């Protein structure tokens, strides 16, 4: 295999790993899709992860640069494995993390206000549309220990109440209707 072909193979695998990461974290092209750790989705992402792991393991690494990049890809696979496990065992995370998502969109995202508001609206709509599934996943994961989440949700509620007061600061161009 020519090094150009090998380099392209590395690039494609890097891209596929990034896409899987984006899917798990609901980033970029997946930002309007809420990743909910149903057994089917977890199975699907684990299959994808296993496929990518096999492809990375089978990569040629003819010199130190390729070995370094291959090592990086393996490290990234390890982090994705951890992310998959965290998503599976913490179905409440999207709800608890929303306050951080709001702050990221409000403070760090440099897209137009209209786009940022649209992204936030879609995310909230996805929570609303999937609330029964989310609650079922939480109940399935925690069962009788659901009460252990109460302090985390109470904190998240306080954070959201604080940020609700800052919405005018975050989005100064918006009207109440928006």
Name each model-derived stretch.
Residues 1-178:
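N-terminal maturation segment of proteins
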């Amino acid at each position: 295999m020519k090094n150009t072909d090998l380099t392209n193979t590395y690039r494609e695998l890097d891209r596929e790993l990034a896409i899987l990461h984006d899917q798990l974290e609901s980033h970029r092209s997946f930002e309007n899709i809420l990743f909910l750790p149903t057994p089917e989705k977890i199975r699907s992402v684990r299959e994808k992860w296993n496929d990518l792991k096999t492809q990375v393991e089978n990569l040629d690494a003819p010199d130190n640069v390729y070995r370094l990049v291959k090592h990086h890809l393996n490290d990234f696979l390890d982090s994705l494995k951890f992310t998959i496990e965290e998503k599976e065992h913490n179905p409440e995370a999207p709800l608890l993390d929303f306050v951080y998502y709001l702050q990221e969109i409000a403070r760090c995202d440099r897209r137009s206000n209209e786009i940022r508001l649209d992204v936030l609206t879609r995310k909230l709509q996805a929570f609303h549309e999937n609330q029964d599934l989310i609650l079922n996943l939480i109940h399935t994961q925690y069962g009788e220990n659901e009460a252990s989440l109460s302090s985390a949700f109470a904190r998240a509620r306080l954070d959201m109440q604080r940020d609700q007061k800052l919405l005018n600061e975050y989005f100064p161009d918006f009207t109440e209707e928006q």
